[in-house]
Amino acid sequence: MAFIAKSFYDLSAISLDGEKVDFNTFRGRAVLIENVASLUGTTTRDFTQLNELQCRFPRRLVVLGFPCNQFGHQENCQNEEILNSLKYVRPGGGYQPTFTLVQKCEVNGQNEHPVFAYLKDKLPYPYDDPFSLMTDPKLIIWSPVRRSDVAWNFEKFLIGPEGEPFRRYSRTFPTINIEPDIKRLLKVAI
């Protein structure tokens, strides 16, 4: 079992450009973490909505995308290819993320990123679909398999401004529909 951090603020990641992303710098801001893939059927929708949320809360929300290739091999780009894939292929049209993308990682199994070990421990299933599981066992390419595993691309985790994991959302929950929860956490009038 992966090491589980004691606090959200003890975690970190490495951005696509190789810089350390220290979660301790996120104190006082809500954080939205989403496992992403550039070749998924919902890539355009979800990446566009991630940009929208980051633009709506530029100083009070941190959006982090974690590319992962564990679901249908839909993020088969190398780290240095991901931004060009997003810009020219899907979503395409010159798309550029307004949020931070970190280096490709695993979100399930023995080599899961410590961020996901922590988040799945605190939020073991999506609130909108508590029975969400990988539907086709032939697609499971990691071990060990756990009930709390991320089921597919674009699962989302929302963390409050005090570093407390607030809610996990399934892949079918539209990213933009998280906005009321972000406002609630930031105490913004809805």
Swiss-Prot record:
<keyword id="KW-0560">Oxidoreductase</keyword>
<keyword id="KW-0575">Peroxidase</keyword>
<dbReference type="GO" id="GO:0005737">
    <property type="term" value="C:cytoplasm"/>
</dbReference>
<dbReference type="GO" id="GO:0045171">
    <property type="term" value="C:intercellular bridge"/>
</dbReference>
<protein>
    <recommendedName>
        <fullName>Glutathione peroxidase 2</fullName>
        <ecNumber>1.11.1.9</ecNumber>
        <ecNumber>1.11.1.12</ecNumber>
    </recommendedName>
</protein>
<dbReference type="InterPro" id="IPR036249">
    <property type="entry name" value="Thioredoxin-like_sf"/>
</dbReference>
<comment type="subunit">
    <text>Homotetramer.</text>
</comment>
<dbReference type="GO" id="GO:0005829">
    <property type="term" value="C:cytosol"/>
</dbReference>
<dbReference type="GO" id="GO:0047066">
    <property type="term" value="F:phospholipid-hydroperoxide glutathione peroxidase activity"/>
</dbReference>
<dbReference type="InterPro" id="IPR029760">
    <property type="entry name" value="GPX_CS"/>
</dbReference>
<keyword id="KW-0712">Selenocysteine</keyword>
<keyword id="KW-0963">Cytoplasm</keyword>
<dbReference type="GO" id="GO:0004602">
    <property type="term" value="F:glutathione peroxidase activity"/>
</dbReference>
<comment type="similarity">
    <text>Belongs to the glutathione peroxidase family.</text>
</comment>
<feature type="active site">
    <location>
        <position position="40"/>
    </location>
</feature>
<dbReference type="Pfam" id="PF00255">
    <property type="entry name" value="GSHPx"/>
</dbReference>
<comment type="function">
    <text>Catalyzes the reduction of hydroperoxides in a glutathione-dependent manner thus regulating cellular redox homeostasis. Can reduce small soluble hydroperoxides such as H2O2, cumene hydroperoxide and tert-butyl hydroperoxide, as well as several fatty acid-derived hydroperoxides. Cannot reduce phosphatidycholine hydroperoxide.</text>
</comment>
<dbReference type="GO" id="GO:0072686">
    <property type="term" value="C:mitotic spindle"/>
</dbReference>
<dbReference type="GO" id="GO:0006979">
    <property type="term" value="P:response to oxidative stress"/>
</dbReference>
<dbReference type="InterPro" id="IPR000889">
    <property type="entry name" value="Glutathione_peroxidase"/>
</dbReference>
<dbReference type="GO" id="GO:0009055">
    <property type="term" value="F:electron transfer activity"/>
</dbReference>
<dbReference type="InterPro" id="IPR029759">
    <property type="entry name" value="GPX_AS"/>
</dbReference>
